[in-house]
């Protein structure tokens, strides 16, 4: 091979001299303005090298792509890079500019957009990274994602997106937030929706105007150049992820998703440790856990694939302290010491904290394992000492036989019931911090499935315990499950009603139909049953119409309903009759609203469907408000208030007047069919008995 005026002309040519038998033509120099031409008759097996430099420049080349044997990634490189072919079967090739999205394979044969250059093109050329002869031709960077400075990000926006200097300066805080909270990392991915949700929360907290999702994607790519996207997840649940970026360890955003199942899978697939530790390891638990990963439940899918659900629950909730057990003058059971009482307090507190931890991570499937581990501890050792957890010598394990004795002990039963009320109320406030806030349907369904499984899980875990203990524990869990079902239903109604309240034409039709209702007739019929003040009823009617006419939002309606409850129950504050007055108000509210709906039905009102939906929502939300007012007045949790009515025999005297108790007792005296049955069944028996008498 000869070098003809090497490097002396901008339009340098490369001459090839082959053997005599080949008689291959020689490429002649061409002017700089002439188009790129390809040598047609080159025989690779007979190309010979002539002494001289083995690297030739082919003019001004904008960008070259190099092959990195270690990273297996193609990367853009500034300047001109030249490669020496290895072996006699390859051709001398100059690789020129190309888009950055080069597939990660070793075959590249492209030549384009080069002015003033004559090249030899081949579709099977290899690029050898080790062929560089001069260090100043090394690639400037690899294709790994790397963060830009704030100035570089603004420059990229102005250059690539055409954003003016004024607009780009307004985005300084947005770009700086990305630099402060995120960093590049290999083998890590973040859901695109999660990152955008973090950004929206940042804008809300700092009173900034957020950009839309598409523009936000441009902001990210201006800061983290080379960022790629991947679609990850199971079929039907896949989401777009940014690949090569993660939260910084010191970012405050970590508290929103600390140790979630997603982070365990994507960022720490091997070394991540479960946050909860059962009191003991059960035989086969590890195998069951491994097998369950192959058959993902809906709850696992929500926790793994929808990390953004974390923003809809209260992960910063503070778990209240438990009260001390009030032993009074009751003697301790035989074989039980105060040390056992203290050990039970410590063990049950840690068990409840583990439950809180699992629910915060939306790992509902672990609740069953927690309960199995707690209620099926090891029996006492032969020497009578308590076993200790091998992983933590400070955490005792109550033997199962002693645990049964303690659960039969009346002061401990009351103490554990109070602790359960605190625990389950905290879980409700974590999962549904705001009953009116929009929640994804997948999260709502996961919560409802969780509530459906609770009673069965606890019953199976306590199958060896006496029925009295199981009944007491399941009663509180039932109240918790019922509360979750009610609140998720209320949330569903709120989202459906929100669309109605935002529709101007529907609101106008509702107002027109409501003005045709004969409220005087409604009041006349309801007064005998409810015995309400006429002035109060008229005021509520006028306020309702005014609020509807103003096309108030759902939040404004919620405030109006809250004011109604305050106004009605204010005369009973501090009185023992407060719970009864609250229940009576719910009955009267429901009766009046049903009378209005009946009138609308008889008049064939066009907005009947909208009124029916609104009525369902307002009845449920009124129940929610009254429930919390009664809990506040009695010093109990809402779970405790509702739990008292789940079992008639344990109904608190605080929530019922003596007249109510005596009336219910006298009605049921002497009827063997009714005694010992739940309230619902008693009502059915009494109804059937009355119909037979008729």
UniProtKB/Swiss-Prot annotation:
GO cellular component: cytoplasm; nucleus
InterPro entries: DNA-bd_RFX, RFX-like, RFX1_trans_act, WH-like_DNA-bd_sf, WH_DNA-bd_sf
Keyword Transcription regulation belongs to the record: yes
Biased composition, class Polar residues, residue ranges: 288-299
GO function terms (MF aspect): DNA-binding transcription factor activity; RNA polymerase II cis-regulatory region sequence-specific DNA binding
Pfam family, one: RFX_DNA_binding
Protein name (Swiss-Prot/TrEMBL): DNA-binding protein RFX2
Gene: rfx2
């Amino acid at each position: 091979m000869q070098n003809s005026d090497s490097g002396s002309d901008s339009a340098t040519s490369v001459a090839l001299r082959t053997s005599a038998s080949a008689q291959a033509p020689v490429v002649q120099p061409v002017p700089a303005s002439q188009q790129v031409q390809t040598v047609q008759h080159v025989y690779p097996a007979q190309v010979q090298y002539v002494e001289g430099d083995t690297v030739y420049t082919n003019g001004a080349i904008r960008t070259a792509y190099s092959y990195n044997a270690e990273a297996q990634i193609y990367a853009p490189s500034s300047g001109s890079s030249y490669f020496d072919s290895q072996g006699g079967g390859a051709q001398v090739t100059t690789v020129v500019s190309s888009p950055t999205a080069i597939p990660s394979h070793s075959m590249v044969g492209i030549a384009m957009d080069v002015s003033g250059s004559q090249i030899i093109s081949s579709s099977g050329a290899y690029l050898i990274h080790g062929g560089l002869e001069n260090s100043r031709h090394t690639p400037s960077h690899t294709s790994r994602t790397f963060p830009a400075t704030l100035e570089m990000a603004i420059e990229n926006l102005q250059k690539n997106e055409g954003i003016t200097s004024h607009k780009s300066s307004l985005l300084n805080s947005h770009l700086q937030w990305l630099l402060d909270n995120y960093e590049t990392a290999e083998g890590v991915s973040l859901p695109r929706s999660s990152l955008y949700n973090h950004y929206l929360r940042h804008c809300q907290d700092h009173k900034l105007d957020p950009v839309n999702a598409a523009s936000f994607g441009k902001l990210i790519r201006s800061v983290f150049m080379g960022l790629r996207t991947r679609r990850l997840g199971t079929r039907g649940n896949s989401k777009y992820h940014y690949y090569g970026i993660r939260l910084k360890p010191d970012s405050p955003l970590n508290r929103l998703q600390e140790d979630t199942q997603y982070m365990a899978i994507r960022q720490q697939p091997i070394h991540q440790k479960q946050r909860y530790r059962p009191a003991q390891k059960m035989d086969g638990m590890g195998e069951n856990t491994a097998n369950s990963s192959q058959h993902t439940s809906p709850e696992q899918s929500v926790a793994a694939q929808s990390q953004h659900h974390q923003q809809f629950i209260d992960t910063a909730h503070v778990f209240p302290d438990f009260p001390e057990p009030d032993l009074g003058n009751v003697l301790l059971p035989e074989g039980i010491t105060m040390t056992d009482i203290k050990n039970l307090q410590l063990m049950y507190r840690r068990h409840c904290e583990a439950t809180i931890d699992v629910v915060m991570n939306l790992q509902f499937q672990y609740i069953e394992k927690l309960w199995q581990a707690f209620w099926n501890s090891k029996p006492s050792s032969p020497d009578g000492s308590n076993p200790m957890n091998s992983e933590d010598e400070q955490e005792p394990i109550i033997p199962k036989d002693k645990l049964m004795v303690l659960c039969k002990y009346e002061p401990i039963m009351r103490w554990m019931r109070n602790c359960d009320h605190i625990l389950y109320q905290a879980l409700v406030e974590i999962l549904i911090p705001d009953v009116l806030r929009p929640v994804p349907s997948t999260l709502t369904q996961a919560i409802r499935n969780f509530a459906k499984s609770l009673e069965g899980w606890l019953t199976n875990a306590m199958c060896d315990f006496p029925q009295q203990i199981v009944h007491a524990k399941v009663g509180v869990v039932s109240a918790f499950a019922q509360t979750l079902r009610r609140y998720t239903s209320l949330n569903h109604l709120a989202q459906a009603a929100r669309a109605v309240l935002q529709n101007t034409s529907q609101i106008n039709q509702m107002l027109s139909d409501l003005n045709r209702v004969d409220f005087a007739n409604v009041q006349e019929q309801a007064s005998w049953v409810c015995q309400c003040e006429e002035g109060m009823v008229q005021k509520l009617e006028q306020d309702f119409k005014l609020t509807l006419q103003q096309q108030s939002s759902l939040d404004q309606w919620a405030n109006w309903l809250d004011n109604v409850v305050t106004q009605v129950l204010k005369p009973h504050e501090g009185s023992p009759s407060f719970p009864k007055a609250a229940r009576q108000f719910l009955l009267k509210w429901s009766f009046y609203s049903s009378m209005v709906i009946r009138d609308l039905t008889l008049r064939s009102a066009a907005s009947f469907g909208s009124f029916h939906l609104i009525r369902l929502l307002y009845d449920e939300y009124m129940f929610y408000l009254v429930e919390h007012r009664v809990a506040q007045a009695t010093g109990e949790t809402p779970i405790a208030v509702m739990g008292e009515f789940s079992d008639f025999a344990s109904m608190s005297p605080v929530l019922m007047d003596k007249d109510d108790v005596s009336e219910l007792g006298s009605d049921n005296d002497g009827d063997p069919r009714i005694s010992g049955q739940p309230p619902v069944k008693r009502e059915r028996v009494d109804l059937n008995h009355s119909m037979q008498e008729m």
